[in-house]
């Protein structure tokens, strides 16, 4: 399964960062990035940035990462900000897992891979697939505002 890496870079970068989280959660439970926390911590912080909530008593800067931007948009307007799609995309997968539960999410993730295997998926197909698995409309509205 692939995607348009220029037009929807967040899809593969976010999925890869989420896959790193799954690996870390399974095999590296004591890893904390030299005091910077786990990927789960980073995903939770990203969600707080998106929603304006505090985490551990701290207020974080508002998230302005636009998942609809292409690589050309990032290059033109904010080359250094591109790296944020890794965490925002990964955080979206993480939040969907939290809402569905680990087992249901993994079953749906397997179906997602089977559905789009040997083809490509775009942001709208991603949204439609996952809206068929749960009520993510409010979550998606947060991530694409």
Predicted regions and their residues:
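The feature captures the short pre-catalytic strand/loop hairpin that immediately precedes
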Residues: 58-79
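Extended hydrophobic/Leu-rich segments
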Residues: 43, 60-61, 96, 136
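Flexible, active-site-adjacent loop/turn segments at secondary-structure boundaries
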Residues: 4, 8-9, 13, 65-69, ...
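Zinc-dependent metallopeptidase catalytic helix centered on the HExxH motif
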Residues: 1-49
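Amphipathic alpha-helical substructures
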Residues: 31-33, 73-75, 81-145
């Amino acid at each position: 399964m692939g995607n348009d890496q220029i037009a929807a870079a967040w899809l593969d970068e976010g999925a890869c960062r989420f896959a790193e989280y799954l690996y870390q959660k399974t095999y590296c439970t004591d890893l904390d990035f030299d005091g910077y926390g786990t990927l789960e911590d980073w995903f939770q912080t990203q969600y707080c940035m998106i929603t304006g909530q505090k985490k551990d008593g701290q207020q974080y800067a508002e998230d302005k990462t636009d998942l609809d931007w292409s690589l050309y948009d990032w290059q033109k307007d904010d080359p250094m900000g591109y790296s944020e799609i890794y965490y925002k995309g990964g955080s979206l997968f993480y939040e969907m897992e939290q809402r569905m539960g680990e087992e249901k999410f993994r079953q749906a993730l397997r179906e997602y891979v089977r559905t789009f295997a040997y083809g490509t998926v775009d942001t709208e197909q991603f949204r439609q697939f996952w809206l068929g698995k749960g009520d993510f409309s409010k979550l998606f509205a947060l991530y694409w505002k």
